[in-house]
């Protein structure tokens, strides 16, 4: 289910990033150290009173070539386009500025709820001065000291109160996927080619995200697909459209709404940092991943071309060793007929459930091959394992001491599970828990 979105806006140096980190809490830390992946800090997930939501820091979207006020306005426009709830941040230390008023003037046009935060309210005297901010016309100001964590609970309460009502769970039989990649990798051509392959295409309907267009289609076996697309990629004339961080943010939102991500790479250009960043986000989000190398027809090839390209992919995407690769051409149609079946196979792997008895046989065989590690004379004991979730498949391994389960041994167990069962295209999670 797609999460609602909260966007943070405000001029520089009012403390947007600190507020972002406060709201995100521990969730913004990188749980898994993935070499070569830069985790983008403008997009995170927060949770309060059991409600989860995405947070966007529009201040992370840099428009360095643009005039100062143009950048401020662009941030506000992004918030109005993307968010369910908008947080406007001002500085209680410096008071109201022209830039604050410019943001307020833009936010007057939105029908989205706006929460006004007066940051850097670190003492009672400054708290008395927050009433000046009523003149912005954005409602009751919330006094906050993001550095000290003062007042953030009230802000989180306000966020949750203003989030849209939760919608019912969507049909799990429908496969939702998105095509993600840098500009000019051929996403549009691939979309058109996929939809042109004698599919029964329903009329595009508005998705749960504002201004998003999701395309529903059915294949020859009556499997229903939803192709997630973001209309923002189709808009023109917006000053922030070509900034990389805005593109990253759009991609992250599409990933959030997808079951499976088709990571599209331009064969002519190879893998760039953007690709690694987005792939890392999809991996951490537990999404199914299919690597699609487009424009394969444009390369001059010899017997080793595909082998060399796969080596580059596996070297740079070490954390995606489970993701299948397909080399296609949207222009000629080469191998495009494979995509729907590959997507369905990944969807099947994501939803695969393994009985505890069969799983534990695999675990015990693995331990026989490679005995559990020891630390200071104490050996790790594995009592049993069980599957607790799907999408992605998640297993809990009950042990005598969690600290004895080294990451490398957990990875070994994962590899043995993958050898025993078909989990191609999906991450699987193994969690060590002390048996009580």
UniProtKB/Swiss-Prot annotation:
Residues that coordinate or bind GTP 2: 181-188, 229-233, 294-297
Domain KH-like per the UniProt entry, residue ranges: 352-436
One GO BP annotation of this record: ribosome biogenesis
Species of provenance: Lactococcus lactis subsp. cremoris (strain MG1363)
Protein name listed in UniProt: GTPase Der
UniProt keyword GTP-binding, yes or no: yes
Residues reported in the UniProt entry to bind GTP 1: 10-17, 57-61, 119-122
Function recorded in the entry: GTPase that plays an essential role in the late steps of ribosome biogenesis.
Pfam families in the cross-refs: KH_dom-like (PF14714), MMR_HSR1 (PF01926)
One of the record's GO molecular function terms: ribosome binding
Subunit organization: Associates with the 50S ribosomal subunit.
Gene3D superfamilies, per the entry: 3.30.300.20, P-loop containing nucleotide triphosphate hydrolases
EngA-type G domain residues: 4-167, 175-351
Matches recorded under InterPro entries: G_ENGA, GTP-bd, GTPase_Der, KH_dom-like, KH_dom-like_a/b, P-loop_NTPase, Small_GTP-bd
Keywords: GTP-binding, Nucleotide-binding, Repeat, Ribosome biogenesis
Phylogenetic placement of the source organism: Bacteria, Bacillati, Bacillota, Bacilli, Lactobacillales
Keyword RNA-binding: no
Family named by the database record: Belongs to the TRAFAC class TrmE-Era-EngA-EngB-Septin-like GTPase superfamily. EngA (Der) GTPase family.
Domain of life: Bacteria
């Amino acid at each position: 289910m797609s999460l609602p979105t909260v966007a943070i806006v405000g001029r520089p140096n009012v403390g947007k990033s600190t507020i972002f980190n406060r709201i995100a809490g521990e969730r913004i830390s990188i749980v898994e150290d993935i070499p070569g992946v830069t985790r983008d800090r403008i997009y995170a997930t927060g949770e309060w009173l059991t409600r989860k939501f995405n947070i966007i820091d529009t201040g992370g979207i840099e428009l360095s070539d643009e005039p100062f006020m143009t950048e401020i306005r662009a941030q506000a426009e992004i918030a109005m386009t993307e968010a369910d709830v908008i947080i406007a941040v001002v500085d209680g230390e410096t008071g109201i500025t022209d830039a604050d008023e410019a943001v307020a003037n833009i936010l007057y046009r939105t029908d989205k709820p706006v929460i006004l935060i007066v940051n850097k309210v670190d003492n009672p005297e400054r708290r008395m001065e927050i009433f000046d901010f009523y003149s912005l016309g954005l409602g009751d100001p919330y006094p906050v000291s993001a550095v000290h964590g003062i007042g953030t609970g009230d802000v989180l309460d306000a966020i949750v109160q203003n989030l849209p009502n939760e919608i019912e769970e969507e049909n799990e039989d429908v496969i939702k996927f998105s095509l993600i990649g840098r500009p000019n990798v051929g996403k549009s051509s691939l979309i058109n080619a996929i939809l042109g392959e004698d599919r029964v295409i329903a009329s595009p309907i508005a998705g749960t995200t504002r201004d998003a267009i999701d395309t529903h289609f059915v294949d020859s076996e009556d499997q229903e697909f939803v192709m997630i697309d973001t209309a923002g990629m189709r808009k023109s004339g917006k000053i922030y459209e070509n900034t990389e961080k805005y593109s990253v943010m759009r991609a992250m939102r599409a990933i959030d709404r997808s079951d499976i991500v088709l990571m599209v790479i331009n064969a002519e250009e190879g893998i760039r940092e953007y690709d690694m960043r987005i792939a890392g986000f999809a991996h951490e989000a537990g999404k199914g991943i299919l690597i699609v190398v487009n424009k394969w027809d444009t390369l001059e090839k010899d017997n080793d071309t595909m082998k060399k390209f796969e080596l580059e992919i596996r070297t740079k995407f070490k954390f995606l060793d489970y993701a299948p690769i397909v080399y296609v051409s949207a222009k000629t149609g080469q191998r495009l007929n494979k995509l729907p079946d590959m997507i369905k196979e990944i969807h099947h792997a994501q939803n695969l459930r393994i009985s505890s008895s069969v799983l534990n046989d695999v675990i015990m065989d693995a331990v026989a091959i490679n005995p559990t590690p020891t630390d200071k004379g104490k050996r790790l004991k594995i009592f049993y394992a069980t599957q607790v979730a799907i999408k992605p498949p998640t297993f809990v391994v009950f042990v005598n001491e969690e600290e004895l389960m080294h990451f490398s041994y957990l990875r070994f167990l994962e590899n043995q599970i993958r050898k025993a069962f078909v989990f191609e295209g999906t991450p699987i999670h193994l969690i060590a828990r002390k048996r009580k």
